[in-house]
Amino acid sequence: MSASAKEVAASLLRSFHTAAEGRSPYRHWFLRDCLPQSTVDEILSLPISAADLGGVSGKRELHNASRHYFDVANRAEHACAESVSSALQDPRVAAEIERIFGVKLGGTYLRIEFAQDVDGFWLEPHTDIGVKAFTFLLYLSTDPTHADLGTDIYDNDKKWVGRSPFASNSAMIFVPSNTSYHGFEPRKINGVRKSLVINYVTNEWRAREQLSYPEQPVTVAEPAFA
């Protein structure tokens, strides 16, 4: 049976409350056990194929036509997409994100990409600053060879300084700024590296079809619950 949005929200909150914080080269957090295991299993089983990169990589937007989101259509079709989206849209969850991670989410919009990266994929260092207010990189795939496929972290000079752990149902969070350089160094990917790229974006986001709730901005509960 699929986990409910309430169960997903409770799992997310537990992972937020136990997140391990790092402050160098910018403030970030590593999380574990983000979603109910049944939800992870359902997402991994979604009937969505990974795209062929055609030898081109470096930026995700180079393959916009073949990207997939927990958008209105996928929310309607897949229970796991609906429960995850609903949990992250929950005003009480938004309030806890604000409290723990020091970000303002009121009036933003939820965008969840189901990323499936194959061999040849890489990302140049970038910050996400601009229309992305919050970044939550939730790793999913269970292949033990993916342990070294975490997000690469860079300093202000775009010099590599570290890498997030990669384990199924773990994550990295940061608040985009002019110092939040991150990317993915070219390296071997066996099979498909699956993750959710979760962002809260401002109203200036143009591709409204990518949003989970394109007509419904995030509201924040007051007071927050623990």
Task: Name every feature range the model reports, one short phrase each.
Residues M1-S24, Q210-A226:
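Fe(II)/2-oxoglutarate
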Residues V8, F16-I100:
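Non-heme Fe(II)/2-oxoglutarate
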Residues A9, A19-G22, L62-H63, A167, ...:
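Short linear sequence motifs
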Residues T39, A50, S168, P217-V220:
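A generic alpha-helix propensity feature with a strong bias for hydrophobic helices
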Residues A73-Q89, V93-P214:
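Catalytic core of non-heme Fe(II) oxygenases with the double-stranded beta-helix
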